[in-house]
UniProtKB/Swiss-Prot annotation:
GO biological process: one example: translation
Domain of life: Bacteria
Keyword Ribonucleoprotein: yes
UniProt cross-references to NCBIfam families, sorted A to Z: L9
HAMAP family: Ribosomal_bL9
InterPro entries: Ribosomal_bL9, Ribosomal_bL9/RNase_H1_N, Ribosomal_bL9_bac/chp, Ribosomal_bL9_C, Ribosomal_bL9_C_sf, Ribosomal_bL9_N, Ribosomal_bL9_N_sf
Listed GO CC annotations: cytosolic large ribosomal subunit
Chain's role: Binds to the 23S rRNA.
Protein name (Swiss-Prot/TrEMBL): Large ribosomal subunit protein bL9
The family this protein is said to belong to: Belongs to the bacterial ribosomal protein bL9 family.
Organism: Staphylococcus aureus (strain NCTC 8325 / PS 47)
Gene Ontology molecular-function annotations: rRNA binding; structural constituent of ribosome
Pfam families in the record: Ribosomal_L9_C, Ribosomal_L9_N
Keywords assigned: Ribonucleoprotein, Ribosomal protein, RNA-binding, rRNA-binding
Length: 150
């Protein structure tokens, strides 16, 4: 019997969500269909599956387009962060990704999660720094941060 998996199943007749697979009739009736792990692969259900896949692909494409637009916006702006300094322009502590995210939100009304910024040690000196940002699995951008004396 041909079934469409509605969720991931591990074990004898394993399959991933959305996968169409031929399984024994008893296994399908007594386990997969009974526990709602799968539905029978009727022409209507197959068509519905195709529509779901198409919709998911369009949503993913839209996410990528949004990330590319945000990358373009970030490349044209500069974030100014002020920090306390000592002699010779050395900062007391460092400028963290949290401070950069807050400044970006306050100055340009752009919200980016601090965990998406790749700045393991923070910024330790005055001046300009380019901070890489992972906007999407496929799209990376850069935030230009200007650290000034407070």
């Amino acid at each position: 019997m041909k079934v469409i998996f509605t969720q991931d199943v591990k074990g004898k007749g394993k399959g991933k969500k959305g996968e169409v697979k031929e399984v024994p009739v008893g296994y399908a009736n007594n386990f997969l269909l009974k526990k709602n792990y799968a539905v029978e692969a009727t022409p209507g259900n197959l068509k519905q599956l195709e529509l779901q896949k198409k919709r998911a692909k369009q949503e993913r494409q839209q996410e990528i387009e949004d990330a590319k637009a945000l990358k373009e916006t970030l490349s044209n702006i500069e974030v100014e962060v002020s920090a306390k300094t000592g002699e010779g322009g050395k900062l007391f502590g460092s400028v963290s990704t949290k401070q950069i995210a807050e400044a970006l939100k306050a100055q340009h009304d752009i919200k980016i999660d601090k965990r998406k910024m790749d700045l393991p040690n923070g910024i330790h000196s005055l001046g300009y720094t380019n901070v890489p940002v992972k906007l999407d699995k496929e799209v990376e951008g850069t935030i230009r941060v200007h650290t000034v004396e407070q």
